[in-house]
């Protein structure tokens, strides 16, 4: 809204909105008026902070009403998952994955619900005001107060498979409290020990980049970097805008239809310019990688000073600025892990939840395909946009349109509750890159018996094999009512429902060897209920037989009506799953029908196992196997908490260009990628072009790797800061043939220097590109004073004295050590 000269923003101003306002004001009105605005905002803030106050009480912690339903439905889903595991449909890795995914989704939904609940019901809630304004605390902490703590990680970062379902307002039980202590310990350890690592990484980067000072306005390089703009989605365009604003164009952009020049080469890209070039397929820009100055960097290749949105000034220490920009978030985030207290955080999959209680309806006949998800759960895959209607009391209350490639888990006509998960995006169901440790887990037999591989393996469920338990003994006898306490002589334990489970019966007229039998029965605990004497009548019409094998391994059922086929279509030798109801009996274990007679049938206990392609089998078909003997080994990734404490070693590994980790060679390490790229390009290009192109490949790899770590923690670092550090460690080549030069084989030279020298030599220098890690680069500095102040002081100074080296005092460090004016800022002009 615009009322004359008054600009009105009708929205809540949190931290980000204030940042956007100041940025907009600065670019439109300049720095002097922005300074006045900031003064007014400061006075306004302090005035109201003085006259108002916030107090936080237990009544302000409002738990979302949907929490109980969410937790209950998640437990039901996991119960079904464990049953599928018992029936051999999935393996234990699928169980672990689904448990982690389910609790992550519940946690994420509760976090959103907590905020929405406060936003809708109590807008002036102190907790909401403090957190959402960005003044104090984070949503993660609010979630723990009024949502649930969720999965925790121990001091090594491993996920503890026991979720804390309560929050701090409800209070934790004993078990949850002790699990919670693991996380608190992790926070303390990280704060105490890992902060030093973050600080040391900053120091090494500063030593590497301290010579990068803006020395000239232009280096007149012929190199440039191409950025593709076409076929990008909204997220990509937002990312590209951040990448391009503040850069300088290397090539003029012309309107193809009119021939008019839209943007000239050498012009910096601002918001206005970006709107002009957004419809072009590609643009060419200058980056620090393109700069060909021997020392420092030029203004055009660097671009804007992002602090003020103007071209960087001559004499600016952009190298140290870059090192601090990368190092500081690492230090801050390491200390911040203390406050979150070891809560396991991973990206939750994108799920679709019901907006209300009611019944779901959609057309089953069009645009759907029956599929299984990665946990072998039945689902419908939408092949096109699907209309979903939710009814409450037979009245249509909500209509949703699901995009194609969505998995639906609820059938039409089923009752659903508010916030129930009814589907998920297929992209989230694909296997994500998981941060964790690859492990090989041994799977052992839980019972003794014979291995059996069915002829046909299901496409949906992979390979399934069974362990068939072996019969040890069989006996029968009749028991009557229980009349004496804890006596098993002539007693009957009978069922209380039509579905019989966990009962103990024997047949009549057979000798039992009372002592051995009694001893065996003491160990059996599968007793459901004992019947009161007054309520039980003597019953001889039903005879049910239990054959004991290694404590209840084989079950024999006798039917009083003496039907010929008591189990319908089940044949001898077929396998039955846990929970199946057979002639009013619910099977407690997976079983195989091994004998069927006129009066009874015999079942043998079996145990199914599911395997996949990563399984290393240790058994063959039909051998006998003992309890606890190795069945197979399976590879899986044990997920760990991914916070900055795990991220910083990754940044360090990339910037130090490590080849080994824990005495093992790193597969696809930067050195291997660079060498492979160089020799591939060398087939088509000359030495210089091949070296530059292979450096481009590794530079992109390193920048993406570092950005991934910081983006996962929600930290934005401008690409140009990382580019400056990466430029330093990818600027050297190793001489393989000195040609007409005075250099030796194995000497390290700057690529820009070699390019200049080769233009003057008849027999050119032949070389290969190399990566120097931060430490190695600092120790190969031209200044021996800077080298000595970093590490190995005695060795560096002794070697410099023996070689008679001269130090030209061109960098910051050497001038600082000797007390001279540093060649930056006002010292640069002098």
From Swiss-Prot:
Record: residues binding Zn(2+): 219, 291, 298, 301
Note accompanying the cofactor annotation: Binds 1 Zn(2+) ion per subunit.
Q: Which metal ions or organic cofactors does this protein require, according to UniProt?
A: Zn(2+)
Instruction: Identify the SUPFAM superfamilies for this entry.
Output: beta and beta-prime subunits of DNA dependent RNA-polymerase
Which coarse location class applies to the principal site listed for this UniProt protein? plastid
Superkingdom assignment: Eukaryota
The reaction(s) annotated as catalysed by this protein in its Swiss-Prot or TrEMBL entry are: RNA(n) + a ribonucleoside 5'-triphosphate = RNA(n+1) + diphosphate
Q: Which GO terms describe its cellular component?
A: chloroplast; DNA-directed RNA polymerase complex; mitochondrion
Asked if the record carries the keyword Lipid metabolism, the reply is no
Q: Which CDD domains match?
A: RNAP_beta'_C
Subcellular locations according to the entry:
Plastid, Chloroplast
Keywords attached to this Swiss-Prot or TrEMBL record, sorted alphabetically, are:
Chloroplast, DNA-directed RNA polymerase, Metal-binding, Nucleotidyltransferase, Plastid, Transcription, Transferase, Zinc
The record ties this protein, via Gene3D superfamilies, to:
1.10.132.30, 1.10.150.390, 1.10.1790.20, RNA polymerase Rpb1, domain 3
A Gene Ontology biological process in which this protein takes part is: DNA-templated transcription
Question: What does the record give as EC number?
Answer: 2.7.7.6
Q: Name one GO molecular function term.
A: DNA-directed RNA polymerase activity
Q: Which family does it belong to?
A: Belongs to the RNA polymerase beta' chain family. RpoC2 subfamily.
- Describe its function: DNA-dependent RNA polymerase catalyzes the transcription of DNA into RNA using the four ribonucleoside triphosphates as substrates.
Q: Describe the protein's quaternary organization and the partners it interacts with.
A: In plastids the minimal PEP RNA polymerase catalytic core is composed of four subunits: alpha, beta, beta', and beta''. When a (nuclear-encoded) sigma factor is associated with the core the holoenzyme is formed, which can initiate transcription.
Protein known as? DNA-directed RNA polymerase subunit beta''
Species for this entry? Euglena gracilis
């Amino acid at each position: 809204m615009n009322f004359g000269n008054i600009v009105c923003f009708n929205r809540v101003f949190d931290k980000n909105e204030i940042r956007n306002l100041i940025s907009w004001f600065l670019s439109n009105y300049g720095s002097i008026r922005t300074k006045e605005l900031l003064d007014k905002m400061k006075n306004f803030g302090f005035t109201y902070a003085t006259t108002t106050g916030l107090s936080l009480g237990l009544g302000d912690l409002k738990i979302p009403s949907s929490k109980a339903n969410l937790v209950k439905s998640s437990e039901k889903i996991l119960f079904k998952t464990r049953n599928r595991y018992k029936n051999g449909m999935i393996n234990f890795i699928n169980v672990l994955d689904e448990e982690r995914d389910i609790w992550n989704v519940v946690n994420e939904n509760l976090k959103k619900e907590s905020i929405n609940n406060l936003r809708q019901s109590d807008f002036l809630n102190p907790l909401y005001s403090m957190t959402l304004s960005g003044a104090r605390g984070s949503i993660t902490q609010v979630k723990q107060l009024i949502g649930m703590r969720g999965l925790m990680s121990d001091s090594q970062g491993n996920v503890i498979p026991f979720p804390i379902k309560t929050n701090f307002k409800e209070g934790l039980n004993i078990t949850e409290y002790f699990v919670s202590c693991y996380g608190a310990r992790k926070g303390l350890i990280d704060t105490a020990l890992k902060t030093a690592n973050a600080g040391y990484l900053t120091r090494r980067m500063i030593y590497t980049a301290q010579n990068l000072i803006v020395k000239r306005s232009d280096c007149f390089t012929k190199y440039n970097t191409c950025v593709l703009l076409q076929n990008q989605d909204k997220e990509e365009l937002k990312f590209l805008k951040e990448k391009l604003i503040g850069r300088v164009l290397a090539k003029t952009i012309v309107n193809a239809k009119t021939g008019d020049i839209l943007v000239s080469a050498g012009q910096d890209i601002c918001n206005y310019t970006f709107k002009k070039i957004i419809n072009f397929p590609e643009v060419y820009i200058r980056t620090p990688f393109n700069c060909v100055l021997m020392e420092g960097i030029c203004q055009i290749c660097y671009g804007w000073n992002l602090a003020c949105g103007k071209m960087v000034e001559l004499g600016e220490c952009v190298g140290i600025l870059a090192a601090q920009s990368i190092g500081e978030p690492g230090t801050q985030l390491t200390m911040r892990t203390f406050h979150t207290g070891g809560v396991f955080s991973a990206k939750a999959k994108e799920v679709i939840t019901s907006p209300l209680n009611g019944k779901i309806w959609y057309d089953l006949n069009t645009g759907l395909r029956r599929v299984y998800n990665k946990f072998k759960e039945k689902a419908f895959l939408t092949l096109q946009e699907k209309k979903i209607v939710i009814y409450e009391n037979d009245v249509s209350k909500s209509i949703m349109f699901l995009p194609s490639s969505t998995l639906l888990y609820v059938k039409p006509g089923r009752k659903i509750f508010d916030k129930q998960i009814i589907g998920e995006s297929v992209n989230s169901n694909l296997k994500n890159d998981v941060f964790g440790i690859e492990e090989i887990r041994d799977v052992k037999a839980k019972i003794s018996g014979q291995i059996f591989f069915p002829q046909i393996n299901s496409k949906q469920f992979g390979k399934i094999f069974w362990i068939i338990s072996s019969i040890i003994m069989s006996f029968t006898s009749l028991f009557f009512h229980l009349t004496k306490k804890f006596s098993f002589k002539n007693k009957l334990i009978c069922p209380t429902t039509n579905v019989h489970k966990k009962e103990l019966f024997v047949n009549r007229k057979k000798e039992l060897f009372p002592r051995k039998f009694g001893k065996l029965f003491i160990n059996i605990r599968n007793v459901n209920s004992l019947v009161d004497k007054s309520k039980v009548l003597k019953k001889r019409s039903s005879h049910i037989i239990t054959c004991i094998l290694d404590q209840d391994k084989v079950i024999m059922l006798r039917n009083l009506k003496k039907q010929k086929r008591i189990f319908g279509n089940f044949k001898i030798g077929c396998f039955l799953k846990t929970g199946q109801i057979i002639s009013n009996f619910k099977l407690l274990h997976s079983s195989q029908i091994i004998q069927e007679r006129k009066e009874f049938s015999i079942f043998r206990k079996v145990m199914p196992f599911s395997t996949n392609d990563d399984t290393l089998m240790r058994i063959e078909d039909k051998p006998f196997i003992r309890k606890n003997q190795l069945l197979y080994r399976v590879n899986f990734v044990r997920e760990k908490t991914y916070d900055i404490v795990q991220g910083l070693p990754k940044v360090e590994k990339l910037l130090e260009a490590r080849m080994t980790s824990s005495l093992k060679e790193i597969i696809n390490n930067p050195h291997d990628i660079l060498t492979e790229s160089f020799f591939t390009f060398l087939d088509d290009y000359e030495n210089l072009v091949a070296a530059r192109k292979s450096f481009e490949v590794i530079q992109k790899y390193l920048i993406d790797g570092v950005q991934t770590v910081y983006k996962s923690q929600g930290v934005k670092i401008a690409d140009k800061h990382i580019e400056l550090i990466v430029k330093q460690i990818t600027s050297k080549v190793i001489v393989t043939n000195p040609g007409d030069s005075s250099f030796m084989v194995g000497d390290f030279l700057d690529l820009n220097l070699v390019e200049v020298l080769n233009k003057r030599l008849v027999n050119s220098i032949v070389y290969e590109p190399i990566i120097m890690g931060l430490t190695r680069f600092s120790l190969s500095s031209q200044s021996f004073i800077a080298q000595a102040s970093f590490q190995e002081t005695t060795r560096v100074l002794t070697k410099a004295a023996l070689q008679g080296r001269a130090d030209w005092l061109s960098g910051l460090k050497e001038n600082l050590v000797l007390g001279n004016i540093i060649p930056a800022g006002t010292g640069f002009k002098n």
